[in-house]
């Protein structure tokens, strides 16, 4: 297939996938479910076509129009798959999506006429996720077929240092701050904040989220992240010395002796547990689990020994969601678990970009990450898989927690941006493309978490 045809096929596949995704999100959030009662007939609304007398009817007709346009995109993807000689597995996946789409439309019609009855809604959502998954898998396979055998661009020199701190200004305070990995704090605190916001919506009449709970939980989170980062600096100091990206870290350069760093980590850990315990005991237990998992299970067991360290290690980033939820409710709940699932699935789609950008560095450090042991093509393919899984889990979160239009718009628009940069990564295959995709992943999750907080507590 020609380059132009290949590019066109990828564009249509991506458009079809994101079209299906937008329908899923709109249907799962209150932006559609709240409007469904305004139109309980199909295909017209109470005998009228394109009646737009209210915002609810605008939402309904917008959804139905988008469904028609998305259907055309799915048909276009199927036609191109067969006409361009795509692989058998790609044709199978796209044809499956095409076959299921009319079924999805019929179930959607019954859902509308039954005023969103639970059985129809559940089947409608499940089938929609299946169609979306088929298109995402087809997209990943297509990109792999088009670019998997092509060489990656040569890296332009040694990677720049990305940790906080300036080796030309080795102030002791700066060095201790660097130990705490402050660049991780904003996003992980947002995760905990989103967990608290979701949990606050479950509180009964007369109950509300207190400022003390927020301060203690986020303060404990900052301290626990600092403790985990400090222990990581100490335990990985020999590997860090071999890597250009990390050979300026405080323990490696002996600005802070390992013994002092270890003591600092212990102080931070104890302080974090004290803050969490002031909220409730289960929050403290989860905080201790997070520190131990990152410092011991991930750093000592997973990262040096298995290419699946990124996937399994995602649990460390997911735990703040549970910590935030438990801080408010005192117990683990479904909303907190699903939010943690979103973070868990996002982690490989996020970190694999960094692993690609610094593949040679990680190889020098002796870390068997996926790009090192399985190759760059497979890693890029898995980034697309995990983007799809992350977006699907975000739909489940909306369905179970009643999030609204701000959340819907954020996950669709930023999800499309994330996918776009992953596609560019396949085309360009260099460090800059990997870092653009990495930053897009941060933007997606950061904006999504802010939307959760605003949709739950403000809008």
From Swiss-Prot:
Function per UniProt: Converts heme B (protoheme IX) to heme O by substitution of the vinyl group on carbon 2 of heme B porphyrin ring with a hydroxyethyl farnesyl side group.
Annotated source species: Halobacterium salinarum (strain ATCC 29341 / DSM 671 / R1)
Keyword entries, A-Z: Cell membrane, Heme biosynthesis, Membrane, Transferase, Transmembrane, Transmembrane helix
Full protein name: Protoheme IX farnesyltransferase
Pathways involved: Porphyrin-containing compound metabolism; heme O biosynthesis; heme O from protoheme: step 1/1
Other remarks in the entry: Carbon 2 of the heme B porphyrin ring is defined according to the Fischer nomenclature.
GO molecular function, one term: protoheme IX farnesyltransferase activity
Record has Transmembrane as a keyword: yes
EC number: 2.5.1.141
Catalytic reaction(s) noted: heme b + (2E,6E)-farnesyl diphosphate + H2O = Fe(II)-heme o + diphosphate
Protein family: In the C-terminal section; belongs to the UbiA prenyltransferase family. Protoheme IX farnesyltransferase subfamily.
Segments traversing the membrane: 9-29, 66-86, 93-113, 123-143, 184-204, 211-231, 262-282, 284-304, 325-345, 382-402, 403-423, 438-458
Residue numbers spanned by region Protoheme IX prenyltransferase: 185-459
Renumbered residue ranges of the record's region Unknown: 1-184
NCBIfam families the record matches: cyoE_ctaB, PRK04375.1-2
Keyword check for RNA-binding: no
UniProt membrane topology term: Multi-pass membrane protein
